[in-house]
């Protein structure tokens, strides 16, 4: 989903770039292809035409739910949770749920980085487990629930991503 030297680990400031990707097969590929063409046509002077013959022809793969969410304009990413997320984490922990959070050890934006730490302290006090990724830069936006449900995306868990950047 990302194109640039930093995503390949070629920028020394960040080192190894840790992200999460997944392989999608079946009918869901058609939804992604449509979303790509619509986004391309919105951003480019060279318009792509939607032809049925150009679409990926999928063989049925099974019955797994999937949701494709349209994205909005690109912007600088931040990692500052808001009060509602911090409160939700605290409530979950105090209810006996094992909450684990991983954040990068290297800042991309120092102000945002330290603001994140101010929220993390409260989550730690409530009993959440917080890990700091040391092997490079953590860019992944992944949520796992009980090893059965996953969310892999581009949105940060913060006010800008949830309310401003159409993520």
Regions found by a protein language model. Give the residues of each.
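Charged, low-complexity intrinsically disordered terminal segments
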Residues: 1-167
């Amino acid at each position: 989903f990302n194109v640039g030297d930093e995503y390949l680990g070629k920028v020394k400031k960040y080192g190894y770039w840790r992200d999460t990707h997944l392989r999608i097969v079946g009918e869901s590929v058609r939804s992604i292809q449509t979303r790509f063409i619509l986004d391309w046509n919105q951003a480019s002077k060279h318009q792509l035409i939607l032809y049925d013959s150009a679409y990926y022809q999928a063989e049925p793969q099974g019955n797994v739910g999937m949701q494709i969410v349209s994205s909005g304009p690109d912007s600088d990413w931040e990692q500052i949770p808001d009060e509602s997320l911090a409160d939700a984490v605290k409530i979950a922990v105090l209810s006996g749920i094992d909450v684990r959070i991983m954040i990068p050890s290297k800042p991309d934006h120092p102000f945002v980085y330290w603001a994140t730490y101010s929220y993390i302290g409260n989550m730690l006090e409530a009993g959440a487990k917080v890990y700091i990724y040391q092997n490079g830069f953590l860019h992944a936006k992944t949520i796992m629930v009980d090893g059965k449900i996953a969310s892999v995306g581009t949105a940060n868990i913060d006010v800008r991503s949830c309310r401003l950047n159409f993520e």
